[in-house]
């Protein structure tokens, strides 16, 4: 054993390693050239004996200055081509040296782009990556934690003992370690020691797979190992703007759409049953469906209904079912509740094969305080603001991202690109945008901080949203970016180069509240609230609006859509059909929440599944038939979608018949005379000869009637259509004399010939 004048230094470094306080293990560990010799130092806690295997020779490593620090002398530079033979408690195994890999994984260009917030593929560097270096397979770990005192990899590989595998701190607060002993499927966390000496066990913010709740470790997973066959879909999607096409969205929550008996286990490809993931105590003996089962059952169902897109409530990994997915801890991982990342890829792939787009709810506005998550990540407020007046949603119990920090914005923007690139999704809906835009959102006076100009706008969040949308459309020009924004913030759907937020669709929350308020009123009193049903057109062209009846409107005592309606069951069904038909004829893209398509009666409950048994009853079948036919009509009649955002596409015929609660309007595609006339009767009265003015004489075919018997209605109508009569009304010389069924919406199409 060579003598060294650095004995005290080596002993000090070894003590730091034992106490998990060393941020530079490569300084002492691995191969070093010293006094004309190659020295290898190995850190092996609780090892009894260590040997080095190199070029068919074995060299004993002696313990130096610390019982777990071993040193051996080799005759030449070993590079990466040696192995360590370790004996512990009578058990011997051989492995490569984690500290023999000395090159930086994250290079200068990567660090620079990340530091300025512009590394749009940062997930290809951060996190856990299965790689092969110098013929040795293993896992490269990389994490950003600039304020940590030390970080170790912990997992089954080392009995979750942070003393075994300290990471190397690099420039820019990056930590790295190559683990040649780890493989796909291994569970791990980062053990982070703070400057104050506290120890946190954190899941990987960039992890591609996590354990099923209640466990919360990260799992080593391959990234690029799926064969897509949707290239034509992606090409068509990105060749033109999607907002000028029909968009009808089925919003849903994967965990509460349909449950399965725990006795009926999902079988893996090898025939082995998969451990079931229990649904909830509310329905003992039931389990969640897997991604493959959802592929088999959900996609045909949505296709049969005629929806163009599925919108999934958040599927990023989250620990608490009751958050509905909106309190995310695993931003780069589809939740393991339903299966593997590749199984989710196959779900998206199959959606595209069947002509269905996939929209994900994305939650960049806040994150939970779970100890294994982003909160106080490296002992400091790294991802969140330190001041709770700008860094916390107290009402929600969550933290707010610090959008002024480049690396935090990079984490989020890259995450957005990740879902499109790695999972081929077609759109996002950004949740709770208003909570991001305003510093005083849900805050009383004295509990928020004005911006630099003294206002309540969150300037940093605005810039983040603009950056996210700008980058998204740079990479994926055919993407959908939908804002759930509940205020009158201007230019939400205007391009960023015009000063807008850059979304291309915005949920019309005003329309939704007005319509639900209107339909909850007894029909006999609706005449006093006519403005509620007509007001939306006055601002309809200020943004690119999507009409949404979402999950938020069927929870927390609000009742499901059917039970919001007044009157007996017949009137509830008729009102529901009338509202849905009016929605499909009103300008704007469409979104409804699962269960509305067949008249769910109970409020949505995340722990339960839908009331599928209701489809045994004709009125509920009728509502589902209505949705099927509305979606078919919607896609076939360009007048219903082509000019959603152009005033040319809509014209009132009469919006002032308050006493009858009747409205009528036209939808137009182009300058031909084949427009649609829509007439809505929002009372139970039947009108036998109601006159509606039209601009051109001829035959108007009745192409839809929400009162049809197929939908559970009374089947009153106009015998297939009407010829105009010479009658001056509504500033037109021609009119249709129509039968208006009770609580109904009828659609007529002008034809050049009968």
UniProtKB/Swiss-Prot annotation:
- Any one of the GO CC terms: cytosol
Q: In which pathway does it act?
A: Glycan biosynthesis; glycogen biosynthesis
Under CDD domains, the record lists:
AmyAc_Glg_BE, E_set_GBE_prok_N
Q: Which reaction does it catalyse?
A: Transfers a segment of a (1->4)-alpha-D-glucan chain to a primary hydroxy group in a similar glucan chain
Q: Which GO terms describe its biological process?
A: glycogen biosynthetic process
Per UniProt, subunit arrangement is: Monomer.
Similarity remark: Belongs to the glycosyl hydrolase 13 family. GlgB subfamily.
Identify this protein by name. Answer: 1,4-alpha-glucan branching enzyme GlgB
- Species source reads Prochlorococcus marinus (strain MIT 9215)
Organism ancestry:
Bacteria, Bacillati, Cyanobacteriota, Cyanophyceae, Synechococcales
> Which gene is annotated as encoding this protein in its UniProt record?
glgB
């Amino acid at each position: 054993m060579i003598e060294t004048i650095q004995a005290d230094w080596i002993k000090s470094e070894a003590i730091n390693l034992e106490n998990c306080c060393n941020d530079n293990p490569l300084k002492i560990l691995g191969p070093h050239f010293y006094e004309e010799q190659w020295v290898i130092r190995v850190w092996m806690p609780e090892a009894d004996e260590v040997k080095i295997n190199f070029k068919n020779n074995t060299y004993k490593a002696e313990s130096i200055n610390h019982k777990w620090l071993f040193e051996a002398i080799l005759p030449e530079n070993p590079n990466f081509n040696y192995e360590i033979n370790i004996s512990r408690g009578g058990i011997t195994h051989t492995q490569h040296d984690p500290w023999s890999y000395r090159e930086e994984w994250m290079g200068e260009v990567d660090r620079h782009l990340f530091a300025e917030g512009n590394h749009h593929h940062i997930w290809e560097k951060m996190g856990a990556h299965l790689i092969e270096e110098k013929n040795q397979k293993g896992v490269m770990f990389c994490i950003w934690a600039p304020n940590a005192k030390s970080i170790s990899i912990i997992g089954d590989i080392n009995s979750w003992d942070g003393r075994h595998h300290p990471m190397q701190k690099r420039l820019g607060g990056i930590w790295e370690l190559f683990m040649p002993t780890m493989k796909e499927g291994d569970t791990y966390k980062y053990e982070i020691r703070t400057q104050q000496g506290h120890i946190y066990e954190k899941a990987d913010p960039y992890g591609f797979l996590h354990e099923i709740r209640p466990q919360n470790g990260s799992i080593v997973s391959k990234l690029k190992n799926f064969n897509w066959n949707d290239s034509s879909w992606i090409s068509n999607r990105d060749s033109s703007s999607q907002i000028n096409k029909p968009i009808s969205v089925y919003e849903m929550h994967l965990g509460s759409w349909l449950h399965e008996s725990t006795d009926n286990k999902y079988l893996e490809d090898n025939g082995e049953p998969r451990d079931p993931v229990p649904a909830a105590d509310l329905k003992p003996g039931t389990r969640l469906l897997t991604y493959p089962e959802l592929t088999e059952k959900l996609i045909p169902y949505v296709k049969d209904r005629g929806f163009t897109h599925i919108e999934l409530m958040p599927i990023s990994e989250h620990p608490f079912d009751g958050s509905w997915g909106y309190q995310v801890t695993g931003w780069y991982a589809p939740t393991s509740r339903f299966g593997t990342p590749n199984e989710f890829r196959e779900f998206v792939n199959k959606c595209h094969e069947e002509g269905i787009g996939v929209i994900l709810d994305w939650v960049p506005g806040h994150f939970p305080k779970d100890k294994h998550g982003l909160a106080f990540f490296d002992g400091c407020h790294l991802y969140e603001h330190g001041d709770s007046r700008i860094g916390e949603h107290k009402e929600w119990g969550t933290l707010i991202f610090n959008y002024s920090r480049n690396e935090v914005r990079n984490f989020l923007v890259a995450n957005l690109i990740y879902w499109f690139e790695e999972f081929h999704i077609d759109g996002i809906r950004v949740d709770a945008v208003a909570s991001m835009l305003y510093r005083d959102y849900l805050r009383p006076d004295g509990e928020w901080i004005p911006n630099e100009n003294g206002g309540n706008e969150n300037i940093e969040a605005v810039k983040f949203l603009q950056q996210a949308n700008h980058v998204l459309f740079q990479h994926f020009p055919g993407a959908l970016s939908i804002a759930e924004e509940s205020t009158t913030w201007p230019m939400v759907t205007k391009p960023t180069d015009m000063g807008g937020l850059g979304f291309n669709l915005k949920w019309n929350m005003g329309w939704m509240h007005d319509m639900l308020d209107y339909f909850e009123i007894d029909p006999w009193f609706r005449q006093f609230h006519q403005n509620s049903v007509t007001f939306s057109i006055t601002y309809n062209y200020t943004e690119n609006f999507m009409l949404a009846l979402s999950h938020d409107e069927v929870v927390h005592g609000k009742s499901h859509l059917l039970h919001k309606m007044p009157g007996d069951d017949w009137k509830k069904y008729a009102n529901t059909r009338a509202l849905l038909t009016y929605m499909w004829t009103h300008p704007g893209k469409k979104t409804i929440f699962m269960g509305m398509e067949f008249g769910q009666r109970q409020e949505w409950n995340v722990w339960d599944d839908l009331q599928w048994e209701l489809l045994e009853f004709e009125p509920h079948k009728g509502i589902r038939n209505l949705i099927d036919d509305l979606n078919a009509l919607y896609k076939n009649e360009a007048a219903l979608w082509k000019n959603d955002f152009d005033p040319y596409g809509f014209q009132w015929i009469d919006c002032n018949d308050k006493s009858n609660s009747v409205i009528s309007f036209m939808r137009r595609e182009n300058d031909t005379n084949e427009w649609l006339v829509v007439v809505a009767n929002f009372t139970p009265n039947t009108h036998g000869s109601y006159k509606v003015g039209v601009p051109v004489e001829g035959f108007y075919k009745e192409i839809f009637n929400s009162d049809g018997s197929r939908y559970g209605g009374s089947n009153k109508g106009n015998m297939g259509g009407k010829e105009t009569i010479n009658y001056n009304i509504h500033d037109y010389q021609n009119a249709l004399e129509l039968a208006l069924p009770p609580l109904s919406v009828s659609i007529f199409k002008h034809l050049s010939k009968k």
